[in-house]
Amino acid sequence: MSVRVLNPNAEVLNKSAALHMTINAAKGLQDVLKSNLGPKGTIKMLVGGSGDIKLTKDGNTLLKEMQIQNPTAIMIARTAVAQDDISGDGTTSTVIFIGELMKQSERCIDEGMHPRVLVDGFEIAKRATLQFLDTFKTPVVMGDEPDKEILKMVARTTLRTKLYEGLADQLTDIVVNSVLCIRKPQEPIDLFMVEIMHMRHKFDVDTRLVEGLVLDHGSRHPDMKRRAENCHILTCNVSLEYEKSEINAGFFYSNAEQREAMVTAERRSVDERVQKIIELKNKVCAGNDNSFVILNQKGIDPPSLDLLAREGIIALRRAKRRNMERLVLACGGEAVNSVDDLTPDCLGWAGLVYEHVLGEEKYTFVEQVKNPHSCTILIKGPNDHTIAQIKDAVRDGLRSVKNTLEDECVVLGAGAFEVAARQHLINEVKKTVQGRAQLGVEAFANALLVVPKTLAENAGLDTQDVIISLTSEHDKGNIVGLDLQDGEPVDPQLAGIFDNYSVKRQLINSGPVIASQLLLVDEVIRAGRNMRKPT
């Protein structure tokens, strides 16, 4: 009532109404996303306001693209998107886990239990589950020569949840090899050094890994070569065109001759820079059939392009800054900001540089490089929907391999961890908890089963039969997951189904925290400043 006195237009939901609104919002968001989970999950079609269509089963993409208005659902969506930003996967799992925690809590609250008691039980269960996760994980040695088979299994598990099996298996090698290509000992892995380029032609199975760089533009001079072998690569950030000064300066002249002299001086300055590059080319290419390629971040004007073309030099201008970094890592050499004191040590090397024309688009390939630490995943597909799906899957696959290398451990997948953690909480942890907080632990434990239940449901299996068979196997001491083909228990290690440790840890950490905060909401007040204005 006090809020109504201060603001008669305020909208207030009290106690049980606020709690049920919160729980229903969490359950509603769970129902939207749960059919996407796992290899057998379905695809959602998002239609934008302008009629554009997006097909995806990636939870992160769905939550970012959907227009969510309910405040509770917005809060859960932000948590799930943060999960993806931190660990690269687990968005859908986070949403359905929070939704299931709220659903389990609703049963207890309807029987008269106070939410605070449930929250205390959640906290106990969360700590116990995190401790259990540290004992359940499988250590993996990731030294200078990491185990590629484990990395492939992790990548395959992730990719199969986004794409059909044949394409996922093909992309597995591409994703693993690209991460190992950019990996340097004792340095963090920078996934931005993997360029993801797409070309809309051919089929999705034509996607390939280029150990080098693919640029989305070509040369701007008709007389320049379209293909060159044994190339010296000059990476530079030098203006080879007339440009205005960065400060407010002006030129003053009293007659036409002075103006012409100024124009000639400006042109001479640019030509001198070009000439220094040509001198370096003549120095390194004399007496052999090597070629010379310039990739410049700044502009090159037509007269300069003409001079370079006469010398047989391939020149590309306006390259992206990120590609300059990738080029140095792929080809070697160093990026230069001045043409003064150019030496052969500044140059990189590529065995092959060629231009590919696709319709009105031009692409330049830099391949056959030595010891590359940057690469390009070239995605191909017949339409934009296919390309977008592959892009989302590849990004998640790259993150999963990176997480495995950094965690140096994996977690058995196919729902094995969730079932094992649930049995641990029910059979061991619950007995040590005093009072009604036991019910909070039990609700948390049952909520963990939402992952294997949803996997079974999406595969068209009977969820009750699946859970009974899995829990009975775990009670016998066998760690098993769910085989989605026949619904039988399967050893995830033999089947090669592994999840990321960091993804599971983040899921167990964030899910109960958000659920606890939502359960303790006893009043929803809509009384912002804009509501005070008379209508």
Curated annotation (Swiss-Prot):
GO terms for cellular component: cytoplasm; cytosol. InterPro entries: Chap_CCT_zeta, Chaperone_TCP-1, Chaperonin_TCP-1_CS, Cpn60/GroEL/TCP-1, GroEL-like_apical_dom_sf, GROEL-like_equatorial_sf, TCP-1-like_intermed_sf, TCP-1_chaperonin. Molecular chaperone; assists the folding of proteins upon ATP hydrolysis. Known to play a role, in vitro, in the folding of actin and tubulin. Keywords: ATP-binding, Chaperone, Cytoplasm, Nucleotide-binding. GO terms for molecular function: ATP binding; ATP hydrolysis activity; ATP-dependent protein folding chaperone; unfolded protein binding. Pfam families: Cpn60_TCP1. Its main location: cytoplasm. Heterooligomeric complex of about 850 to 900 kDa that forms two stacked rings, 12 to 16 nm in diameter. PANTHER family: CHAPERONIN. It comes from the Eukaryota. Belongs to the TCP-1 chaperonin family. GO terms for biological process: response to zinc ion. It comes from Arabidopsis thaliana. This is T-complex protein 1 subunit zeta 1. It is found in: Cytoplasm.
